[in-house]
Every structure is written in C-alpha cells, then in structure tokens.
A protein has these predicted regions:
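Acidic, metal-coordinating catalytic segment for phosphate/diphosphate chemistry
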Residues: 1-26
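A generic structural micro-feature
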Residues: 17-21, 48, 94-100, 117-120
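Conserved Nudix-box catalytic region and its N-terminal flanking loop in Nudix hydrolases
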Residues: 30, 34-72, 76
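A short coil-to-beta-strand element that immediately follows conserved catalytic motifs
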Residues: 77-86
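Active-site-adjacent beta-strand/loop module that shapes the phosphate/pyrophosphate-binding cleft
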Residues: 87-113
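NUDIX/MutT-family hydrolases
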Residues: 102-105, 114-147
C-alpha cells in the first residue's frame, strides 16, 4: 500500500494522515427472531450498542480472535458459519484510528453472560427493526444491508 507503514501491532498506518488501521472481528448472531447486541461504554461515559467482538491480536486468525472475544465479553462459545460483511469504525477515543471489522455469521452454543470487567455492560436479543437508541450507525447500516435477518 503506497504511503503506508507497519505499526508495532502489525496493522497498516496511513502515511499522510498519520492514522492507524486496526483489524478486528464482529459476530452477527441471530436466533431467527432477534440479533445479539452488547452495550459498551465510550471513554466519556456515554454508552452504545454494538455487535460482540473486538480487535485482533498480532498474527491472530480472525475466527480464533472472534471466539476469544466472545468468551471474554460474554462467556459464550460460538459456532462460526463464515464471513458475511465488513464494517468500519473511526475511534475518536483511540486517537486517529480506523478499525476494519470483518463480520461473521455465528450461532451461540452456550449461555450469554455479559462481563463488565471486559467492558460489556449488557447483552440483549433485539429484533433488527427494534434497535435500541444509541445503536452504532455502522451496526444499523449492516443490518439494513442484510434484510434476511429477523425483524
């Protein structure tokens, strides 16, 4: 990639912009009636709803990272069907960081128990047409792009 450099975390940073690209994974988990969302908190204390998942570690395989993230955030074991989409997040609390999250279709194979120690304040099964206020716009757009999801 022209004008980019590798950071210590193995991600690419935009040369001219001085920003950083962070790789991550998100789980799109559906029961047939609802989608699993988690509530997290910004650095300023405001909360938001998003899909479970997070950043990948250096050299971590995306599916292994997704399983690790759901264990950490929700104590949940998952079955990963396959990649379905990609979403982008600009993290204002992380300096000039742009995150690229690969989204995977998943099913949970255990109970879901939010872990506040990992920043997961709540978890809910929500119909896609009844998203709570403060659901991230990237999540709303993703669900709109996938009308096959439950409503």
């Amino acid at each position: 990639m022209k004008g980019s450099l590798r950071t210590a975390e193995g991600s690419r940073a935009a040369g001219a912009g001085g920003g950083r690209l962070r790789r991550g994974v998100k789980a799109l988990v559906s029961t047939g009636d609802a989608v699993l969302l988690i509530r997290e908190q910004h650095d300023d204390g405001s909360t938001f709803w998003t899909l479970p998942g997070g950043g990948l570690r250096d050299s971590e395989h995306p599916v292994a990272g997704l399983r690790r993230e759901l264990r950490e955030e929700l104590g949940a074991e998952i079955v990963v069907d396959g990649p379905t989409d990609r979403v982008w997040y600009a993290h204002h609390s992380r300096g000039r960081t742009l995150s690229s999250y690969r989204v995977y279709d998943c099913a949970v194979a255990s109970s879901v128990d939010p872990n506040p120690a990992e920043g997961t304040l709540d978890a809910r099964w929500v119909p896609a047409d009844e998203l709570p206020p403060r659901t991230l716009p990237q999540v709303r757009s993703l669900l709109e792009r996938h009308p096959e999801l439950p409503t």
